[in-house]
Curated annotation (Swiss-Prot):
<dbReference type="InterPro" id="IPR036873">
    <property type="entry name" value="Rhodanese-like_dom_sf"/>
</dbReference>
<dbReference type="InterPro" id="IPR001763">
    <property type="entry name" value="Rhodanese-like_dom"/>
</dbReference>
<comment type="function">
    <text>Transferase that catalyzes the transfer of sulfur from thiosulfate to thiophilic acceptors such as cyanide or dithiols. May function in a CysM-independent thiosulfate assimilation pathway by catalyzing the conversion of thiosulfate to sulfite, which can then be used for L-cysteine biosynthesis.</text>
</comment>
<comment type="similarity">
    <text>Belongs to the GlpE family.</text>
</comment>
<dbReference type="GO" id="GO:0004792">
    <property type="term" value="F:thiosulfate-cyanide sulfurtransferase activity"/>
</dbReference>
<feature type="active site" description="Cysteine persulfide intermediate">
    <location>
        <position position="64"/>
    </location>
</feature>
<dbReference type="InterPro" id="IPR050229">
    <property type="entry name" value="GlpE_sulfurtransferase"/>
</dbReference>
<keyword id="KW-0963">Cytoplasm</keyword>
<keyword id="KW-0808">Transferase</keyword>
<dbReference type="InterPro" id="IPR023695">
    <property type="entry name" value="Thiosulf_sulfurTrfase"/>
</dbReference>
<feature type="domain" description="Rhodanese">
    <location>
        <begin position="16"/>
        <end position="104"/>
    </location>
</feature>
<protein>
    <recommendedName>
        <fullName>Thiosulfate sulfurtransferase GlpE</fullName>
        <ecNumber>2.8.1.1</ecNumber>
    </recommendedName>
</protein>
<dbReference type="GO" id="GO:0006071">
    <property type="term" value="P:glycerol metabolic process"/>
</dbReference>
<dbReference type="Pfam" id="PF00581">
    <property type="entry name" value="Rhodanese"/>
</dbReference>
<dbReference type="GO" id="GO:0005737">
    <property type="term" value="C:cytoplasm"/>
</dbReference>
Amino acid sequence: MAFKHISIAQTLELLDKEDVVIADIRDPNSYQAGHIPGSEALSNANIAHFMMEKEFDQPIIIVCYHGMSSQGAASYLVEQGFEDVYSMDGGFTAWEAAYSEKVER
């Protein structure tokens, strides 16, 4: 099984589902400057804890800057047994351009 690609519009729709997880893998300063509401900062330092507290069938959307690095992180989570993993195409840059009112600062 592989991760799936998801658009920013599809991500916006999924935000209404309470069990969806948005994991932001950008650097801490970028995350603090602005992120998708409800997203969690995910890094090498906290990934083990992140994986322990999530369900394998829980939808997880990985967000990076432009949608490239998120693909590697999404692949890693699938390799660890997570079944419903997405890489958001366009990354936070596209999200902020399209939905500037939906950026938590």
